């Protein structure tokens, strides 16, 4: 409100969005919110439409090109503009934003800026240039989980010299934490069934793969569990939005999902979180369990662990970055073009990455960011004669550095699972905090009265949800695809 740059770290569910919504409503000008989470953008837009009507818009992949062009013509009429960091690389959008009075520039999930953060996004590193190009508005950087090193990196990356920091403990004392060890996958499935049948819902079960979300949903339905659906990033946008709404309206008591679910679902009465697979780092774990108990009521987070789990997070980490052989293959493809031309448009390089080298979007972002940093990509063109073996080896070395950091974070996660002390204390210590006082329900090492989380009322379990059936009802279709 006073025009000062701020970095704020607040626990999940403690009103981070209110930190920019309230000032945005009280001040003149437009609030520009950068978020990497498409579902969260859509959720925020839906909520704000109740307050500012049609003066809110999200620029992301959910919008068609025509919709984006139409919205750009009236940017100044919007009170809140949500945008992905990738969209801010559009010269056309930046040109239009320069014409708008941006009173507040919000960086949501700001830990994505730091290469040492658990969810580093290269395009976040370019936000300092965007801020300068649109007139250096006041900056608000928000995160729920960041170490002191990451907070420092956020300030430096955004060029915030005299920044005010509001940093609160990441502890959620109303969420008890438990780890349950099993020997086999079958035992784990049975343990999941027992927990789902025992615990008061609504609940969320996290898995590390799309296939497992579908497999477990089918398993639970086969055991008589109703009001359950799966959710993952491979589903169509309409399908995902339907499931979110059914969960929000308590028509679904349980969602079996990947990490794609949750950030866009601001549901206050989620009572339990179960991890069927553990995430690759502690910060992700805190984010995910933080979706329980946002109303302050007692909730529980349970992690199921078997000896067969430990290879999965390693493969997830390795899939996040291009391998040495993939980088070498890409360079060979690009160097072949040197005999035809001196430079390639960025669009053609992107096409080679996706189609010939079989890169995914994450790999392409990584390659593009580092080639831009090294000056190999300039003014949206790749200088082919600069693609030396030295440059290739620097990219490979950067991957190795990133992998070592991720493996270290994974070891911290595994240590927490096996720890022989207070789980809450161990988690807080990773972020430089201490547990304050004793809790009735803390963790399985200290004490948990499990009956506090037992089903206390008949839940709406006769609603056997099927998203295909719901889509048919909405669109009046007899069969999907007609």
Residue ranges of predicted features:
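Helicase motor core with emphasis on the C-terminal RecA-like subdomain
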Residues: 1-19, 23-34, 39-327, 377-380, ...
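C-terminal helicase lobe
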Residues: 200-203, 222-233, 245-252, 257, ...
């Amino acid at each position: 409100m006073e025009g000062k740059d701020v970095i704020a770290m607040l626990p999940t569910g403690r009103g981070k969005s209110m930190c920019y919504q309230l000032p945005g409503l009280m001040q003149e000008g437009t609030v520009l919110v950068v978020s990497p989470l498409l579902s969260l953008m859509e959720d925020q837009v839906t909520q704000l439409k109740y307050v500012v009507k049609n003066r809110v818009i999200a620029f992301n992949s959910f919008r068609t090109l025509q919709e984006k062009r139409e919205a750009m013509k009236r940017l100044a009429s919007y009170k809140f503009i949500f945008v992905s960091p990738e969209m801010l690389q559009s010269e056309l959008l930046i040109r239009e934003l320069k014409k708008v009075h941006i009173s507040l520039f919000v960086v949501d999930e700001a830990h994505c800026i730091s290469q040492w953060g658990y969810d580093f996004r290269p395009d976040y590193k370019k936000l300092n240039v965007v801020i300068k190009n649109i007139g250096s508005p006041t900056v608000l950087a928000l995160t729920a989980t960041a170490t002191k090193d990451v907070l420092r990196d956020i300030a430096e990356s955004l060029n915030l010299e005299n920044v005010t920091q509001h940093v609160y403990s990441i502890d959620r004392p109303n969420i008890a934490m438990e780890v349950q060890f099993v020997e086999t996958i079958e035992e784990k499935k049975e343990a999941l069934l027992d927990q789902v049948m025992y615990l008061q819902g609504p609940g969320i079960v996290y898995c590390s793969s799309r296939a497992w979300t579908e497999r477990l949903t089918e398993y639970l339905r086969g055991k008589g569990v109703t009001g359950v659906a799966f959710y993952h990033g491979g589903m169509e946008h309409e399908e995902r939005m339907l499931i979110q709404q059914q969960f929000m309206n308590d028509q679904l008591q349980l969602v079996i999902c990947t990490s794609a679910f949750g950030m866009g679902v601001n549901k206050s009465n989620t009572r339990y979180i179960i991890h069927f697979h553990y995430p690759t780092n502690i910060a992700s774990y805190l984010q995910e369990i933080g979706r329980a108990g946002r109303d302050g009521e007692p909730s529980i987070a349970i992690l199921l662990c078997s000896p067969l789990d430990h290879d999965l997070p390693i493969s997830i980490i390795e899939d996040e970055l291009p391998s040495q052989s993939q980088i070498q293959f890409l360079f060979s493809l690009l160097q072949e073009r040197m005999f035809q031309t001196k430079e390639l448009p960025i669009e053609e390089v992107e096409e080679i990455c996706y189609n010939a080298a079989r890169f995914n979007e994450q790999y392409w972002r990584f390659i593009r960011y580092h080639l831009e940093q090294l000056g190999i990509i300039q003014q949206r063109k790749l200088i082919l004669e600069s693609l030396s073996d030295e440059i290739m080896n620097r990219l490979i070395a950067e991957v190795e550095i990133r992998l070592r950091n991720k493996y270290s974070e994974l070891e911290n996660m595994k240590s927490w699972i096996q720890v022989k002390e207070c789980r809450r204390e161990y988690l807080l210590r990773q972020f430089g905090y201490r547990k304050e006082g004793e809790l009735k329900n803390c963790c399985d090492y200290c004490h948990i009265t499990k009956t506090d989380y037992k089903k206390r009322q008949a839940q709406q379990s006769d609603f056997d949800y099927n998203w295909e059936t719901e889509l048919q009802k909405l669109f009046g279709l007899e069969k999907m695809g007609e």
